[in-house]
Amino acid sequence: MSGKPSKPSSPSSSMLYGSSISAESMKVIAESIGVGSLSDDAAKELAEDVSIKLKRIVQDAAKFMNHAKRQKLSVRDIDMSLKVRNVEPQYGFVAKDFIPFRFASGGGRELHFTEDKEIDLGEITSTNSVKIPLDLTLRSHWFVVEGVQPTVPENPPPLSKDSQLLDSVNPVIKMDQGLNKDAAGKPTTGKIHKLKNVETIHVKQLATHELSVEQQLYYKEITEACVGSDEPRRGEALQSLGSDPGLHEMLPRMCTFIAEGVKVNVVQNNLALLIYLMRMVRALLDNPSLFLEKYLHELIPSVMTCIVSKQLCMRPELDNHWALRDFASRLMAQICKNFNTLTNNLQTRVTRIFSKALQNDKTHLSSLYGSIAGLSELGGEVIKVFIIPRLKFISERIEPHLLGTSISNTDKTAAGHIRAMLQKCCPPILRQMRSAPDTAEDYKNDFGFLGPSLCQAVVKVRNAPASSIVTLSSNTINTAPITSAAQTATTIGRVSMPTTQRQGSPGVSSLPQIRAIQANQPAQKFVIVTQNSPQQGQAKVVRRGSSPHSVVLSAASNAASASNSNSSSSGSLLAAAQRSSDNVCVIAGSEAPAVDGITVQSFRAS
């Protein structure tokens, strides 16, 4: 055997190492509770058992102390250790302050005890006794009696409807009421109700983000350029709105400017400014660095107003306000596409607004056209669900105006645009919904007056090959610079051709342009006659309701049947216009010479 002491083999025996309670202590404890004859063996066994249990309790308490990241063992740790071992904790030993123990000895004994403080009974008797708080009780009172609030202390003083309305629209008024004591709510008796205790509450002022001098100057220049008469400057301003990443602080003011501008110009029937404001909306939507979701409550009503408003211009029968409605419809579709979520249900709410106009027989025809245009831009499923079932109702609305029984030229023009819009958006959907053959009689029974024309359009769509279908886009508002004699004009109409046809031989694309809506200028028609091939012999008529301005001819058409010599000699109209200014015909009331086999004529509309 080695000289090293042997380690204990059991946990209980390991607990005997270190300090332990002696057998004499156990005898003293036994005598204190009335057990006088305790043998030495029993005292020894009890001392060992008590020492083991005390050490385990102290070890567990130390664990609680370490978990609590404390360096000092507390009474709470001992209590938690006792609870873990299913032992009822000791009570009466919890104190916030440190309790000093006093040492005393005498008669062969050493005692530790706490020294009690001396209490002066005279001081206690002289002080006023504290009132015992009352128990919590519930008491009922009448809040309203037959719709009238009684004037009792438990009820707040009633406020008049005028003061409630003022508080709702102007939150700052509450701070003024706190300063003025007489501005409290008036009871029903008419007497001023004064409060005994007046409390001053400081209301935090509404925070407004102030713009720097440079930002204010930029905002002023941008807004003036966007609604001004200088077209190149407007194009630069719109380009800045669509690409500048530092417009976050000015975005609330921009949206408010657009919303207030639409309100004012709709009342004044200023079509040009409404177009400019919608172009600002388009520029803001195209800016990838702006987050417009917080400002849709101002933009959506403005765009919706330009779509379904009853009148947008001074002369609805002549001015081309239909282009603005189409452009605003595309803006609304873009807003729904970008910001529609399962939370806000934006597209569902917009669709519900448009569909209400189709359900009401009192809706103005201009508003009806705007609703149809807005629904048609939201996709084929929307057309299938909301427009197709109401075709017969719409047909009955516009039939009297198209047959000449209506005396209003405005309604007649609106009915014609509604028919054109339906013939444009419905045939592709009807081709999918209905199977061939298509008969005019069936379409008339299902869709009324518009049935035969829709049947012809559906048959044309079925027979036309997919590669030869030319899609004519609605009137858009172009923000690109315009190369013409009138540089400050604004493009309203645009015909878009497929990419495969732009690589062919020259054709014609009409770009009517307006500068501002002038009240003293009648409408015009531009007739463009092509002479290159027999297939292009039919004249294209484009109506516009603005003052006469320049016509820019660009090269885009399908000329597969044109001869090689003619194609090589004619070239592109746009290239010819760049080579010589004589190749661009700017006409107002006279006939122009032919340019590359194309004759352009302009005449007054009757």
From Swiss-Prot:
Signal peptide: none annotated. Keywords: Nucleus, Phosphoprotein, Transcription, Transcription regulation. Its main location: nucleus. The modification Phosphoserine is found at S546, S547, S550. It is found in: Nucleus. GO terms for molecular function: protein heterodimerization activity; RNA polymerase II general transcription initiation factor activity; transcription coactivator activity. GO terms for cellular component: nucleus; SAGA complex; SLIK (SAGA-like) complex; transcription factor TFIID complex. InterPro entries: ARM-type_fold, Histone-fold, TAF6, TAF6_C, TAF6_C_sf, TAF_TATA-bd_Histone-like_dom. Gene3D superfamilies: Histone, subunit A, TAF6, C-terminal HEAT repeat domain. Belongs to the TAF6 family. Belongs to the TFIID complex which is composed of TATA binding protein (Tbp) and a number of TBP-associated factors (TAFs). Taf9 and Taf6 exist as a heterotetramer. Interacts with Taf1. This is Transcription initiation factor TFIID subunit 6. It comes from Drosophila melanogaster (Fruit fly). The lineage of its organism: Eukaryota, Metazoa, Ecdysozoa, Arthropoda, Hexapoda.
